[in-house]
Structure formats: C-alpha cells, structure tokens
C-alpha cells in the first residue's frame, strides 16, 4: 500500500551546517505573504482509529501515518520525481542496488530528542521482524531475499537491495520510516516482538506518543474525535519558501462520524473544512449549497479517477468444507464475477459518477490497463451455465440452487457498516444472485471488526467468514500493480498481511505462484514498456482466476470551504495527490483564513 508522504524538493545547496528543508512555492496556490498562522483544520473519519502503533497499524487512513513526517526521500507532485527530504543528499550505486544517505542535521522528534541514523536502524530491526506482524513486513524482502540496512557512521545510512528494484525509490520515501530509538529499542530489548505489539494502543497517554511530523496527538476520545496539536520542533527543520516555520496551523480536529450521510450534513452545516462527495446526489447537494451561498467554498467535480478499489473476496484458506471448497473453485469465482452488475453499481451506488472495474490496477492508471479485462463482465446466463457445471442444476422449493448432495448455494457477504457505497454494492450483488438461485445473506459490521476477521492468526477460527467487500487505496506509481503484502502467499507475518483470500501461509493455487513470480519480475524491470507488458500479464492472470472480484470505481470530487487555504494548484489536484483526511493539499502548507 502507498504510504508516500507528499514532500517537496529542497531549495538551496546543502552545507555542513544544519539546513532546514524548504517547501517550494509551487506546492501551494497561495503566496507566503498571504498566509495567516494559527487555527484548527477540521476533518472527519468514518470509524475509530485502531492504534497509535506504527508497527501494527494496517487501516487506512491511520494516525501513525498522519503523525509521521515522511522518510529519507519525498515525492514531489508537481514534477512526479523523488528527492531528498529527511536525507540531505544521497548516492546510488551503478548497479542500482545500494543507496547511501547523509541524514539531515537538526531534525527532532516531538519530545525534542534528535532524529538520527539510529532511528532508521530501529525501524529496520523491528519492522523486518516477522513476529512483529507489521503491515509492511513483506516490503523488506525482494523475492524472499532481504534488504539490508547498516549504519556507516553517526550521519550516514546505507541501504542495500538484494536486486535492482525499480520501486526502491518509493520504499525509501514511504515505507522505510524512522522510529524513535529511545522509545522502542528499550522495549524491544526487554520484551521482544510482543512488547512492541503491546505498545501505543489507542488508549495510550498522548504525552507518551513521540512523532516526527508537523502534528502530535493532544487527545483521543473514542467514538468522538482525535485532536492533534502542532509539533513545536517540526518548524525548526521545515520552512516555507519565505523561511517561515511550518506548519501554519495550530492543530487538527478529526471527528469520528460513522455515517457517510452525516458527514455530508456536517460539511453543509459548516463544521468540516473539506469533503469529497462520493455520488451524484451528494455532489448535487454540495453544488446547490455553494451556488446558493449557504456554503462559501470551492467544488471541483470529476477531478480524476480515484486511486482506490472495491472488490469482493472469498475465504479460500482451505477446501475443508463445502463452502471453502466451492470458493476455491475458479469456475465458481468466474460465475460470481458474471453476476456482478457493475453498471447498476455505478448507477445506483455512485449516481453514475464512476466506472466498472475488472482489474486491481486503479482506473487512474489507465495506460497500465490492457484491453479485454472485462471477459467476465455481467452475464447471468453464462454464470448460471458455469454453476450448472459445478452441479447446481436444480432449485429447491425456496428458489435456491442445490447440488445432488443437498448443499444449498448460499453464503454470507460482509461489508463495513460505515460505508454506504459498499452496502449498496452488496445489495446489487444480492439481488442479481437471487435471480439465478444464489442466496446471499448480507451483513454490515464495524470496519475494525471486519479487518480483524481478515487478519491471519495461527488459529484460523478468527477468519470465520465466507466473503467480504472491502477495498485498497494507495500503492506506487512506478509499478502500480499491488504490493508484496497483497501478492505474497507464504512467509506471512502475524496479522496485517493483505493476501486476503488465502491466509494459510502457503501458495494453494498455481496462479498465486505465477502472480508472485510476475510481480518480482516487473519490479526488476527498468524499461517502462517491458514493465507495462509484465503488468498486463499479471492482470490477465487475475482476470482468469478472480481472486479479487473487482466491482466499480468512483470518480473523485473535491470540495472545501473558503475558510481553509493552501490547496495544490489545479494541475496537481487529483486522486494521487490527495489524502482521505485532508484532500488535495499538503497539511504543513494548509492555513485558516480568518
């Protein structure tokens, strides 16, 4: 999953003295002279945050990412390039495997302690340990060979990749984040992996949470809000183009509003600073409110395709039961894909503002998606034929298909209660399946409960589900075909892995092994055309085997009030340069107009 913090290119030459990182002027639509400091940015999240622990967090969005400054390199949305951020400079070896970084001097954690080379060594030591179960554990190997990190001296860090990897630059900007040695290493040495996993729960005293980013946690009220306050040390090493310390804001308030319609009401009432309408009706309400002067602000409809996915995934951990054996049969999954009325989903759930999807590559990356991906598009007649080949030729008195052994074609489909869009998808699926004799019982539960069901444990009783509708967001732009935590099927960490359909810790199906091999082949390919050809093979493999039955994707729309300023310039406003919580802006450059 993409965790790249959007950070600008440093302006000015490096010196032997501590040099701050300078955000360039073209990162914001405002001039430094326009800026007013102070104030609180008001945002919203659909569910409670699960943890403050950066090593075990797997949700999106999550507070550890919000509280992080970023890493060695940063991504520039204006140029699309990567450049030094927490590193002052770096070199790359001729074979593209070794990166050597000079760490920026003068950086501090939110408790005032210096950020040093040791903090990357701590992150490497803990994050790459399988027993910790980090969501990014799989990123620490390249085709099962480990990435190695060493401290050269007090200011120099070396990262050696086992093979040349085209996505290394993204790993160094968004995955390999420093963690405070003075906080985590004593626990690691005394209590090991379990001690780390027990740290920084959502109930931990905010005074004990140490962060690198522009904000730190002030307080968290479960079910109500997260309050962030300015990190007083961030501005010492982060400046705007006029030399002013960042961030401009005093703080951020993230309200927990577990209903998408209630979020809209909050924005229309003037209680939120930014909002992203997700269907035609909500977009129309926002436009009407702005046209009528009820809300003074900016609306950008259809800014771009969305960099996210929604899909249905079956539990294929084994074939021990009638249902898991059925779910493990590719003909069944192909049939289910042909029962997905994606056009109806776009019309009913998205108000026509979206498109059907057939591949895990987000539609925003259209030039990466090959033709012919809709082979298993909506076709109930063909779906019924495949189900008949599996023995479901007759219906019982209740209208449900049944095989010769008396097994009914019935399963439960779970999605998260906070997400109206996915619940609408589930209703469309349920209705279409019923027409051919498949009974689907839809259940909506809390998102955190749903992700707990998906997480792997030695006792697979925790994965007691049939099918789930969920989604992914983020990912890399260099090679936008998923990531190791989604692809790898063995050597899985204890929780947080995203190989959702099979958590047996073994590759049960040939297509899984094929996907793994193709994925790593593409990572080693630096020729763009050849890399896209490999990505096409991966997507065709997905299409034929349907491990994740893709549904539909929204177009993205952005709205914000005149109260909040500092958004990107219009060419940079798209789903790739926006966050769920803050919209199309860098939060360090955001300010409140009063």
Swiss-Prot record:
A GO term, aspect molecular function: peptide transmembrane transporter activity
Gene Ontology CC terms, in alphabetical order: ATP-binding cassette (ABC) transporter complex; periplasmic space
Q: Which InterPro entries match?
A: Peptide/Ni-bd, SBP_5, SBP_5_CS, SBP_5_dom
Q: Which Gene3D superfamilies match?
A: Dipeptide-binding Protein, Domain 1, Dipeptide-binding Protein, Domain 3, Periplasmic binding protein-like II
In its UniProt record, which GO terms are filed under biological process?
peptide transport
Coiled coil in keyword set? no
So what does this one do? Probably part of a binding-protein-dependent transport system.
Q: Which family does it belong to?
A: Belongs to the bacterial solute-binding protein 5 family.
Please identify the protein, giving its name as recorded. Probable ABC transporter-binding protein DR_1571
């Amino acid at each position: 999953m993409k965790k790249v913090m959007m950070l600008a290119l440093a302006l000015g030459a490096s010196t032997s003295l501590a040099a701050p990182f300078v955000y360039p002027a073209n990162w914001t639509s405002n001039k430094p002279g326009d800026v007013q400091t102070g104030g609180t940015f008001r945002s919203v999240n659909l569910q409670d945050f699960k943890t403050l622990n950066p090593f075990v967090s797997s949700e999106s969005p999550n507070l550890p990412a919000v509280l992080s400054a970023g890493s060695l390199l940063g991504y520039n949305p204006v140029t699309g390039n990567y450049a030094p951020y927490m590193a002052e400079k770096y070199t790359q070896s001729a074979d593209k495997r070794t990166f050597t970084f000079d760490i920026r001097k003068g950086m501090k954690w939110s408790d005032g302690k210096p950020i040093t080379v040791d903090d990357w060594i701590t992150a490497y030591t803990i994050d790459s340990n399988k027993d910790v179960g980090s969501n990014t554990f799989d990123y620490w190997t390249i085709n099962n060979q480990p990435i190695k990190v060493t401290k050269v001296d007090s200011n120099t860090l070396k990262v050696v990749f086992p093979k040349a990897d085209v996505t290394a630059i993204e790993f160094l900007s968004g995955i390999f984040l420093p963690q405070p040695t003075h906080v985590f290493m004593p626990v690691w040495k005394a209590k090991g992996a379990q001690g780390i996993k027990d740290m920084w729960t959502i109930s931990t005293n905010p005074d004990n949470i140490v962060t690198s980013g522009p904000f730190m946690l002030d307080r968290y009220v479960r079910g109500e809000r997260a309050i962030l306050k300015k990190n007083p040390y961030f501005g010492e090493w982060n400046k705007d183009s006029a030399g002013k310390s960042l961030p401009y804001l005093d703080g951020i308030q993230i309200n927990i509003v577990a209903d998408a319609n209630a979020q809209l009401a909050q924005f229309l009432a003037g209680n939120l600073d930014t909002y992203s309408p997700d269907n035609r009706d909500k977009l129309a309400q926002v436009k009407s409110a702005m046209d009528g002067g009820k809300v003074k602000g900016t609306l950008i409809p259809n800014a771009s395709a969305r960099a996210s996915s929604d899909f249905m995934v079956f539990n294929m951990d084994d074939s021990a039961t009638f249902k898991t054996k059925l779910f493990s049969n590719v003909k069944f999954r192909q049939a289910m894909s042909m029962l997905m009325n994606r056009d109806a989903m776009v019309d009913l759930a998205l108000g026509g503002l979206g498109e059907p999807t057939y591949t895990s590559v987000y539609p925003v990356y259209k030039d990466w998606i090959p033709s012919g991906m809709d082979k298993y598009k909506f076709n109930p007649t063909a779906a019924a034929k495949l189900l008949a080949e599996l023995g479901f030729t007759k219906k019982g008195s209740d209208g449900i298909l049944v095989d010769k052994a008396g097994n009914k074609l019935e399963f439960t489909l779970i999605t998260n209660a906070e997400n109206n869009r996915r619940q609408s998808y589930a209703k469309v699926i349920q209705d279409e399946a019923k027409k051919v004799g498949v009974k689907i019982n839809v259940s909506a539960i809390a998102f955190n409960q749903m992700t707990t069901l998906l997480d792997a444990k030695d006792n697979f009783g925790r994965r007691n589900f049939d099918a789930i509708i969920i989604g992914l967001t983020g990912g890399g732009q260099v090679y936008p075909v998923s990531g190791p935590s989604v692809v790898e099927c063995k050597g899985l960490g204890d929780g947080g892995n995203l190989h959702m359909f099979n958590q047996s810790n073994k590759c049960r199906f040939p297509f899984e092994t094929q996907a793994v091999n193709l994925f790593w082949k593409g990572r080693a390919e630096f020729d763009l055309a050849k890399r896209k050809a490999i990505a096409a093979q991966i997507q065709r493999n997905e299409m034929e085997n349907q491990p994740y039955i893709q549904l539909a994707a929204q177009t993205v729309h952005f709205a914000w009030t005149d109260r909040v300023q500092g958004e990107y310039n219009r060419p940079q406003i798209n789903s790739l340069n926006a966050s769920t919580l803050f919209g199309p802006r860098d939060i360090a450059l955001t300010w409140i107009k009063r």
